[in-house]
Amino acid sequence: MKITQEEVTHVANLSKLKFSPEETAEFATTLSKIVDMVELLEEVDTTGVAPTTTMADRKTVLRPDVAEKGTDRDRLFKNVPEKDNYYIKVPAILEDGGDA
């Protein structure tokens, strides 16, 4: 499946990203190759293979979920330029963002 430069530009605009025409062309080519690879994988016969089967021989190793004392809030907010009731205020980046 071919991804067009127009589609890349459309998604970039939705994401508030700007790309040069060269970058847009490169992204379109790269994304088309990725979609082609996924389409190729869809052709693999997985009959009888459990959905949770993996080819990797690894197990997920997670650390214990133990609560730890965090950093002092006032110390964290010491260098924050604009705050409101322990929320960091940042400029709105979306149109009609209001006071978000």
Curated annotation (Swiss-Prot):
Heterotrimer of A, B and C subunits. GO terms for biological process: glutaminyl-tRNAGln biosynthesis via transamidation; regulation of translational fidelity; translation. It comes from Streptococcus thermophilus (strain ATCC BAA-491 / LMD-9). Pfam families: GatC. This is Aspartyl/glutamyl-tRNA(Asn/Gln) amidotransferase subunit C. HAMAP family: GatC. It catalyses: L-glutamyl-tRNA(Gln) + L-glutamine + ATP + H2O = L-glutaminyl-tRNA(Gln) + L-glutamate + ADP + phosphate + H(+); L-aspartyl-tRNA(Asn) + L-glutamine + ATP + H2O = L-asparaginyl-tRNA(Asn) + L-glutamate + ADP + phosphate + 2 H(+). One of its GO terms (molecular function) is asparaginyl-tRNA synthase (glutamine-hydrolyzing) activity. It comes from the Bacteria. Allows the formation of correctly charged Asn-tRNA(Asn) or Gln-tRNA(Gln) through the transamidation of misacylated Asp-tRNA(Asn) or Glu-tRNA(Gln) in organisms which lack either or both of asparaginyl-tRNA or glutaminyl-tRNA synthetases. The reaction takes place in the presence of glutamine and ATP through an activated phospho-Asp-tRNA(Asn) or phospho-Glu-tRNA(Gln).
